Amino acid sequence: MFKIMKDFTEQEKIIVLDFGSQYNQLITRRIREFGVYSELHPHTITVEEMKALNPTGIIFSGGPNSVYDEDAFRADERIFDMGIPILGICYGMQLMTTHFGGKVERAKDREYGKADIHVEKPNRLFAGLPTDQVVWMSHGDLVVEEPAGFEVTVTSKSCPIAGIADEERSLYGVQFHPEVRHSVYGNELLKNFALNVCGCKGDWTMENFSEVEIAKIQEIVGDKKVLLALSGGVDSSVVGVLIHKAIGDQLTCIFVDHGLLRKGEADQVMETLQGEFNMNIIKVDAKKRFMDKLAGVSDPEQKRKIIGNEFIYVFDDEANKLDGVEFLAQGTLYTDIIESGTATAQTIKSHHNVGGLPEDMQFKLIEPLNTLFKDEVRALGTELGMPDAIVWRQPFPGPGLGIRVLGEITEEKLEIVRDSDYILREEIKNAGLEREIWQYFTALPNIRSVGVMGDGRTYDHTVVVRAVTSIDGMTADWARIPWDVLEKISVRIVNEVDHVNRVVYDITSKPPATVEWE
């Protein structure tokens, strides 16, 4: 399988080096909020590879290692000599310190949580910010001696050297995590680094992104044909419109009705994308094929792999009926790739767009959105002229309801999730909350409980309502839905959906949980 990669060498950008922190993806997202393109790369990148990327600035992320661990993550030390601004965060600051001859030691007690800092010596990084701030700390080591040529810029009660700077060489380090929202002025600090220190213009927009992508798709595809893995969700729909704008009828959308879609979704997909956008769509009824393969399967990873494989096999079947097809398009997002793991971060769960793909797949893979976060995809959809009904559609995973039915999938369980999810979406819309809640859906855990309905005892299914608020999907908080709305949802589900006698509301944030249950 051959993946088409992007080339943003001409775009001003800040490169984030991944040293394994659970927060490092947030750094990339925050930088983009300032109109500056940013990418995450493994810490193993060489100085030659870094120069080829032509970055405007570099950020060293945090990480779980001690700089003195034998197997600690290191960077190519020549990167420090490139003569461009570098910001080291937490572990990144400690790496910078040891590289330039400073001293790092184990802290007596690991510091984790909110902390008060004092800016001793304001500089370009702290321009316009208060001298006293609340930040988020997460470290087991600390700097006890700054390197020659650096000044101590920030202190805290438990961390006397919480920030260092060499203004002349534009080298900065902070022990805290500005990318985490608990750091009250963290966004402003990162903005100062991007705009003040690195001198970025902040002119990266979805308009120029779409222009670059359309031109790149045209260049890569030429006169060949593309198949799109169309699910009807936001991501694949935006991919479809983007590619259709680039190559028109050279795009054929394969819409697989695998029997794992939401209520009425198959018809809506055909009416909207084929009717309004005049896209070439082949609908494949593969319900029985998928259900046969999933029979008796309970493990979530196995379900994902089966669904991913069957999708590709269906595309292979359809592609064999077409001439000149060389490319397969997918709606893979940056968060999908992140959650599936990088060289330095543990896999959380394999994602449907990056896991389960056969190695001998016959297509070249195009993923135009694989550098974008969800909110950026919505902004791109709006830029492309797509209606709000599509752009603001609830996120829906490629495996569909297959990962919202926990355990073995049956037709009865699918109907329960379809009907309960439809009720949830109706009531959220009736309450005017559809734009306030980032994602909401129902899931069916493999749980039955005792209940009383009418004059009889029941032993039926429990439905979970999941609703979260988020900006980019990297972190999420459970949505504070008004009690009266939750009551309506619960009453309707129990009364209108067969074989359900209990509704529970999931109030777990991400992390520690993921948004989906599987």
UniProtKB/Swiss-Prot annotation:
Reactions that this protein is recorded to catalyse: XMP + L-glutamine + ATP + H2O = GMP + L-glutamate + AMP + diphosphate + 2 H(+)
InterPro entries assigned: Class_I_gatase-like, GATASE, GMP_synth_C, GMP_synth_GATase, GMP_synthase, GMPS_ATP_PPase_dom, NAD/GMP_synthase, Rossmann-like_a/b/a_fold
Pathway it works in: Purine metabolism; GMP biosynthesis; GMP from XMP (L-Gln route): step 1/1
Chain ranges of the GMPS ATP-PPase domain: 204-393
Residues noted as binding ATP in the record, renumbered to the chain: 231-237
Transmembrane segments: none
Domain of life: Bacteria
Keywords: ATP-binding, Glutamine amidotransferase, GMP biosynthesis, Ligase, Nucleotide-binding, Purine biosynthesis
Enzyme's top EC category: ligase
Biological processes annotated in GO: GMP biosynthetic process
SUPFAM superfamilies listed in its UniProt record: Adenine nucleotide alpha hydrolases-like, Class I glutamine amidotransferase-like, GMP synthetase C-terminal dimerisation domain
Catalytic residues, chain numbering: 90, 177, 179
HAMAP family named in the record: GMP_synthase
Role played: Catalyzes the synthesis of GMP from XMP.
Protein name in the entry: GMP synthase [glutamine-hydrolyzing]
